[in-house]
């Protein structure tokens, strides 16, 4: 587990509010220092996380690091179709979480 004293956690936030300050302003989200500036997104289950992961990488051309949380040890879960860079980022994330 990764424990830091300078982490700000907020939610639940809709995806647009988590990622875009303009959406937070339009929706009049108040009192959130994370809205529009999220560095990390958590999903309620592996299925919804996978949908976001696939959409981001395939339609957005992004590289993402993915890891399953809640296990005794870091668990990297990559897809056969993931790029080498996404696999490397996922391994690096798991190594950081293992410390």
Predicted regions and their residues:
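Short, small-residue-biased leader/transition segments that mark boundaries at the very start
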Residues: 1-2
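Glycine-rich phosphate/nucleotide-binding loop
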Residues: 10-99
